[in-house]
C-alpha cells in the first residue's frame, strides 16, 4: 500500500496524498487518484482508437481491389508458367473479395463462396501461388498441413487449430482474420482409405474431412486462442468462416490412373479411336474432374465445398531453368542479395545453371529441389566469405560439381 510515515494514503502513480487530490480509489495493493484515473482512461481510449484505425486501414476497398488480369500479372512476377492455374485463381480470388465488398442490393441474390482446390505434383508451385496472392491483397495468410489434423478426442491437432493460426497471424484482430486466406496443404493425405468401412477408426481421414465441412461452408466456430485441445476454463474466440477463403492443395499421387479409367470408360464405342488420339497421356492431370477426387477418396460434401478445381502442370526442364533465375525472388537473386550485404559481387558461370537444372530433373525434385541443390553448392563459400576480404566471387561449374559430389546426393533425392 502507498502510505507515508504519517499514515497518509497516497496515489501509487503520482505520489500525491489524499489531501492533495479529489479522492483516492482503493485497489488490492495501492491507490489511484481521480486525476490519474482520468489520464489512464484517456490513454486507454486513445490506444484503442489507434488500434481500430489501423485495423480499418487494412480492410479491402472495392476500388483498390486488383482485377483478375492484374492479379495474374503479379503472379507472373513470382511464379513461372502454370497459366491455367493462375487464371482460375485470379478470377476466383477476385470474385471472392468482390463478394465480401458487395452492398446489400435487396434483390435476394447471395453470391456463394468459391473455395479452391489445386492438384499438382510436389514442387509445382501450389503453396507459392497462394502465398503470393495473400501478399498482393495484404490479408492474413496461414498454411496448414492436413496430415497433422485428427478428429476431436485423438492425438493430433483439432480442426479449430487452423483458425488459431490465422488469428495469430492477424494479431488476434478477428474482423481482419475473417477476411484472410487459409492454405490447407496435402489435402490428399486425408482421403478416405477405402470404400469398405474398417473396424479401426480412420481418425485422420474421413473424420477430418467431416470436421472441415463447417469451416469450408461458413459457420461461427469457437476457437481456442492459444491452440491445443479445448478445456472448460479456456476462453474461446468466436470466428465466422463465411468470408475466409480456403485454398486446398495436394499431389494426389496415383490419381492419373483414376482419370485414365474414367476417360477410357467414356471413349468406348463409336468414334472412340479419334477421341483417344487427342488425349495427352503424358499429362493426364489436365483432364481432372470432381468425380476423380471422389474416386481418390474425398467425400462428396468436401468436393462440393471446393467448387473451383484447377491443376498444375508438371515442370519441364525449361520451366525449371526459368524458375532458377527469372522470378523477382528467385533463389539465385536471393544469393546475389545475400552476398551484396557482405559487400561481395556474386556471379555464376552460365553452365552452373544448366547443371543445377539437370540435377533437379535427374532426382525429380521439382522447383523446391532447386533451392536444396543451390544451398548445397553454396554452403562452404557462404561460411568462408564473410571472414575474408574479397569483393568478387564466381561460382564455376567445376566447383558446383565438386560440392555436389562431396555432398550426400541420396539426401537431396528425398528433399
Curated annotation (Swiss-Prot):
SMART domains (UniProt xref): AAA, ClpB_D2-small, zf-C4_ClpX
**What gene codes for this chain?**
clpX
Q: Which Gene Ontology biological process is one annotated for this entry?
A: proteolysis involved in protein catabolic process
| UniProt KW Metal-binding keyword | yes
Write out the function statement from the record.
ATP-dependent specificity component of the Clp protease. It directs the protease to specific substrates. Can perform chaperone functions in the absence of ClpP.
One cellular component (GO) term of this entry: HslUV protease complex
Residues annotated as binding ATP? 121-128
* Any one GO molecular function term: ATP-dependent protein folding chaperone
> From what organism does this protein derive?
Bacteroides fragilis (strain ATCC 25285 / DSM 2151 / CCUG 4856 / JCM 11019 / LMG 10263 / NCTC 9343 / Onslow / VPI 2553 / EN-2)
Q: What is this protein called?
A: ATP-dependent Clp protease ATP-binding subunit ClpX
Positions that bind Zn(2+): 11, 14, 33, 36
Q: Where is the ClpX-type ZB domain?
A: 1-52
Instruction: Could you list this entry's UniProt keywords, alphabetically sorted.
Output: ATP-binding, Chaperone, Metal-binding, Nucleotide-binding, Zinc
Q: Which family does it belong to?
A: Belongs to the ClpX chaperone family.
SUPFAM superfamilies xrefs:
Glucocorticoid receptor-like (DNA-binding domain) (SSF57716), P-loop containing nucleoside triphosphate hydrolases (SSF52540)
The cross-references to HAMAP family, in alphabetical order and at most eight, read: ClpX
Amino acid at each position: 500500500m502507498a502510505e507515508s510515515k504519517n499514515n497518509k494514503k497516497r496515489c501509487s502513480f503520482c505520489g500525491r496524498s489524499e489531501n492533495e487530490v479529489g479522492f483516492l480509489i482503493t485497489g488490492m495493493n495501492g491507490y489511484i487518484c481521480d486525476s490519474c484515473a482520468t489520464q489512464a482512461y484517456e490513454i486507454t481510449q486513445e490506444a484503442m482508437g489507434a488500434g481500430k484505425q489501423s485495423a480499418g486501414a487494412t480492410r479491402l476497398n472495392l476500388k483498390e481491389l486488383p482485377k483478375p488480369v492484374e492479379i495474374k500479372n503479379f503472379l507472373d512476377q513470382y511464379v513461372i508458367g502454370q497459366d491455367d492455374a493462375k487464371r482460375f485463381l485470379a478470377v476466383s480470388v477476385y470474385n471472392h473479395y468482390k463478394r465480401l465488398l458487395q452492398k446489400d442490393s435487396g434483390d435476394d441474390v447471395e453470391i456463394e463462396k468459391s473455395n479452391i482446390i489445386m492438384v499438382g505434383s510436389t514442387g509445382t508451385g501450389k503453396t507459392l501461388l497462394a502465398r503470393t496472392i495473400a501478399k498482393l491483397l495484404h490479408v492474413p495468410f496461414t498454411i496448414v498441413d492436413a496430415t497433422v489434423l485428427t478428429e476431436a478426442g485423438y492425438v493430433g491437432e483439432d480442426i479449430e487449430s487452423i483458425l488459431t493460426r490465422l488469428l495469430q497471424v492477424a494479431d488476434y484482430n478477428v474482423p481482419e482474420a475473417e477476411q484472410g486466406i487459409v492454405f490447407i496443404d496435402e489435402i490428399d493425405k486425408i482421403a478416405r482409405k477405402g470404400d469398405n468401412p474398417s473396424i479401426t477408426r480412420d481418425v485422420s481421414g474421413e473424420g477430418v474431412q467431416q470436421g472441415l465441412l463447417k469451416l469450408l461452408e461458413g459457420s461461427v466456430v469457437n476457437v481456442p486462442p492459444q491452440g491445443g485441445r479445448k478445456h472448460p476454463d479456456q476462453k474461446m474466440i468466436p470466428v465466422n468462416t463465411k468470408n475466409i477463403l480456403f485454398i486446398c492443395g495436394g499431389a494426389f499421387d496415383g490419381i492419373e490412373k483414376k482419370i485414365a479409367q474414367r476417360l477410357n470408360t467414356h471413349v468406348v464405342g463409336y468414334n472412340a479411336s479419334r477421341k483417344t488420339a487427342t488425349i495427352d497421356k503424358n499429362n493426364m492431370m489436365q483432364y481432372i474432374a470432381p468425380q476423380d477426387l471422389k474416386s481418390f477418396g474425398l467425400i462428396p460434401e468436401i468436393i462440393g465445398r471446393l467448387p473451383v478445381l484447377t491443376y498444375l502442370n508438371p515442370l519441364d526442364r525449361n520451366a525449371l531453368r526459368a524458375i532458377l533465375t527469372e522470378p523477382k525472388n528467385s533463389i539465385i537473386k536471393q544469393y546475389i542479395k545475400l552476398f551484396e550485404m557482405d559487400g561481395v559481387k556474386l556471379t555464376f558461370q552460365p553452365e552452373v545453371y544448366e547443371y543445377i537444372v539437370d540435377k533437379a530433373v535427374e532426382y525429380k525434385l521439382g522447383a523446391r529441389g532447386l533451392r536444396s541443390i543451390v544451398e548445397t553448392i553454396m554452403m562452404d563459400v557462404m561460411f568462408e566469405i564473410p571472414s575474408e576480404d574479397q569483393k568478387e566471387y564466381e561460382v564455376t561449374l567445376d566447383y558446383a560439381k565438386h560440392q555436389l559430389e562431396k555432398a550426400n546426393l541420396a539426401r537431396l533425392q528425398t528433399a
